[in-house]
């Protein structure tokens, strides 16, 4: 592609096998791309939502990552990214506390481009422990952003854990897997959603998160038939807390039961 929207992408990686159980990986990434059209040009019947940002520069991202994959110790990876000309939506400076209190933030959202470099570090560890018919699958994620202005918000710590039991039952006529999912992330300034733009925008007024999400599940397989039953967000009925949010002003779903059946027909 050529012209104002031209960009470039470079990816390279290397893998070194230490032995049968352990592997080292490394990768670099470099990209330059124009912001999406919503940032550059937007037209609507609403007076406040018409702009043309011809002065926006290409967003530059340089990344380096390393990984250690072990069948015994688990998988550990780290990635560092430096982002220049980071493009984002947020509210303008003329918004008042009264506007925020009245829930009128959406009327002040505009596209912006950060002039300082945003440094983003991500470290992830994955490991599954197994004992007889029990397994515990774990994913831990640590994130840190170094920035002069708070334009990129992420939770500092995220964990996802699944404890499950797997076994053949009824003289091996059925295979069953049942357990519990646990998800959690630390509180942070969760991006808000703008329905007119169809985009998320940065907000630094209110933190969300720091609550667990518990799901119970049962999966079963009988020949070509698969069945699942899932109780999602179980902890919402176990506590009196009712302020779970998926985004500002968008409540997270309540407790729900989901049932499914997959039956494959063979000729």
Regions found by a protein language model. Give the residues of each.
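Exposed, low-structure sequence patches enriched in small/polar residues
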Residues: 1-267
